[in-house]
Amino acid sequence: KIERKKMSLWGRVGVLIFLIVVLIFAFIPYIGIGLDSFGRGWALTPIPVKYTLQYFERVSIETPKFIINSLLYSGISVFICIIVGVPVAWVMARTKVPGRDLLDSLTTLILALPGTGIGIAYMRAFRDPLPFMNTALLGMWIVIPIVLGVRRLPYTVRGTFASLLIVHKSFEEAAESVGAPKMKTFKDVTLPLIWKGVLVGSLYSFILALQEASATLLLVVPGHEMMTVGIFNFYIGGSVNEAAALGFILIILGTVCLFAISKLAGTKMGGVFG
């Protein structure tokens, strides 16, 4: 039996100081990005003496492609995750077909593969023209959402799989017993019960697709760069404030998605991670 022991006053003070120090170090990067993205005048002070929105205007008006491409390609990758991940999760949870355990292992193994490794693998696999096309997939923009979908597939699969385990098979069996085909049973019975889990897993995939840098840096097509590539380009070009502004927008998008996940999951934002 686990018993709680009351800490001494100095013990509580020590723990509080330790947590404050850890939180300060954890939030320093975010504070720095915020100051760089809004700050204009620095007079040898730790914080800016003037603030501006001109860096946000530049990244959102002069170079909006980074934001548009990120939202578009991440959205397409989530669509790929749902189309592939939901059937995979259903096979794993509802069937006894041979090889489903191997399918589970292969899906999870994707998380162990580094983004640079997947990027190099795609470069070698699709550098030659496709049989039915005169161009290689490597030179097309569609390769970016494909690799993003593959990289984030496990999150959609896990979210759907967990929801399927909660829904008892008797609901589906009752529908099938009155003559409903499996597809209709899934659409009318199962899907309405698991849609929150599918959506939560998909939002996780969307957040991580937005933040993907390693694979997209290798597979980037000129004119189709995402926000992470835009941040890199601004930084190496000496436009640190614009890079910070783009990073701040990325943080806001991720925060909004996490808030949506917490609402769907019915828990606080911190509880989303277990």
What name fits each language-model region?
Residues K6-G11, S37-L44, K50-K65, L210, ...:
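Interhelical loop and adjacent transmembrane-helix boundary motif
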Residues K1-K6, W90-V91, G99, F161-E172, ...:
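C-terminal transmembrane helix and the adjacent membrane-cytosol boundary/short C-terminal tail
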Residues S8-L16, P87-Y122:
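Cytoplasmic-entry segments and transmembrane alpha-helices of multi-pass inner-membrane transporters
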Residues I28-I31, L35-F38, I83-V88, I120, ...:
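Membrane-embedded alpha-helices of multi-pass transport/permease systems
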Residues I61-R94, G99:
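Transmembrane alpha-helix signature in integral membrane proteins
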Residues K1-M7, R40, L44-L53, I61, ...:
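Membrane-interfacial helix termini and adjacent extracytoplasmic/periplasmic loops
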Residues V15, I20, E62-S74, A112, ...:
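Loop-to-helix entry region at the N-terminal start of transmembrane alpha-helices
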Residues I17-Y30, L102, L109, V150, ...:
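Transmembrane alpha-helices
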